Amino acid sequence: MSRTRSCLDRVVAATILLVLLPALLVIMLVVRLSSPGPALFRQRRAGRNRDEFILYKFRSMRCEDSAGPAITVSGDCRITGVGAFLRRYKLDELPQFWNVMRGNMSLVGPRPKLPHHEGLDLPYRPGITGVATLAFRDEEKILAAIPRVQLDAFYEICIKPRKAQLDLEYMHSATPMSDLKQLWRTCSSCLFGPDELAVRESERLNLLVAAWLEITRDADESPSEVEIDCLKSF
């Protein structure tokens, strides 16, 4: 990452935190009052070159239910009413500007993964937003159609490779100007809905879900190697 890009990340993050400070304090208060537990959710994540750090979010789940499945879908009973609103508009991600200030993350980049995930040798700092984040903005809603016991397998086969491809293509040619464009796309997406890429990826993901459900309609049946290759070719 260039020194210019890193400095720009921190300047933008500091400005956003300063401007949004009153709103952040209000959100913290509402989260605390809406359900028992802290306002902030903290979790260890893997960053650039496997360097671990603590990621911050506004808590969107009940504390007693937060240790469930890693993949969250729409209608998940663990999500609070306030949490559902925060997640819908991505407001739960706002505390991560502090991670950018500390140098753990960038504004734009692949999302940070859990330390135990494979393939974590990222040459870039993870980001708050990115091409894959925007492309799969409706992921939770679409994944609700997949049976819970099959979610991990579906994600590994059908979603994870595509996200990695999109992020890698972007990061190979990323510049401060392209980052600013991604931030604008993120704001526009939150306020006005999905853009063309997100619509296209949602259509593709819906087709994958339909194909997966057809292949695995027998609960004891797992996709064959040939069927997995077909799914990956979508």
Annotate each language-model stretch with its function:
Residues H116, L143-I146, L205:
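Intracellular leaflet-associated regions of eukaryotic membrane-associated proteins
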Residues F41-R78, T133-R162:
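Short, glycine-rich, amphipathic interfacial segments at transmembrane boundaries or analogous
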Residues M1-C63, D121, S173-F234:
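A hydrophobic, helix-centered structural microdomain
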